[in-house]
Curated annotation (Swiss-Prot):
Name of protein: Putative S-adenosyl-L-methionine-dependent methyltransferase MAP_3777
Enzyme category, top tier: transferase
EC number: 2.1.1.-
Role summary: Exhibits S-adenosyl-L-methionine-dependent methyltransferase activity.
Organism superkingdom: Bacteria
Annotated GO biological process: methylation
Family per record: Belongs to the UPF0677 family.
UniProt-annotated binding residues for S-adenosyl-L-methionine: 126, 155-156
Amino acid sequence: MRSEGDTWDITTSVGSTALFVATARALEAQKPDPLAVDPYAEIFCRAVGGTAADVLDGKDPDHQLKTTDFGENFVNFQGARTRYFDNYFARTADAGVRQVVVLAAGLDSRAYRLDWPAATTIFELDQPQVLDFKREVLARAGAQPRAERREIAIDLREDWPQALRDSGFDPAKPSAWIAEGLLIYLPASAQEQLFTGIDGLAGHGSHVAVEDGAPMKPEDFETAVAEERAATAQGDQRVFFQLVYNEQCAPATEWFGNRGWTAVGTPLADYLREVGRPVPGPETEAGPMIARNTLVSAVRA
């Protein structure tokens, strides 16, 4: 379970979920018709080694990401999510935004793989050990960012708005924000603080994109946590429900809409259909998760 002030690297606690998601992106890139191609996802997996690399080589057929009930649907989910936010950044760049803020950047490689206009600055915020891992791995691979990239090593439960300003962020200029795969790891109070921080720093013409998820029924969540703990006691290394908070301060469309933003939410299931990927049914392991997920983008006039 989580604790106040807990920290992590890329192979422990919340950090390990970034590696799991990167593995899914790498598997998506292996498809003949990928929704998105992140060449650095595989580099991260091979830097860690073990099952993260084995599954890419077909050496771990029992890996969770290879199951039909969960894995195939989760890989589709990550491919679709990546495309959605990639397209979001293309739109914000076309709109003239030159400040980008990646909250809980994890193994996000958009600074390296997307085409950014000249004079774009990308601020990446995350735990120090996570940023260190990404920088070192990409440096060994000879990768160079395609925009000015500034790391801000900070926990989002701390005063990250001040740290962002100290790193050269200008609230008077338009900015584009992303909170991808983040909110579930924050209690409702911290989500509220995060949204408030964005709202306080985003000037006119700014954009924000959020992956939003409705909470599970409390009894279902408690059952999932109990089952996962029992599996952990039997040696299962997979942990998810013990890392998340089954809370929501408010739907992102509602929160930002009530503060003068024009917000549009796209249910993940609808977006999967739009990009030609199947939507898993409620009887599958991945189905309920996908049904609760909404991709949100908002703009401040």
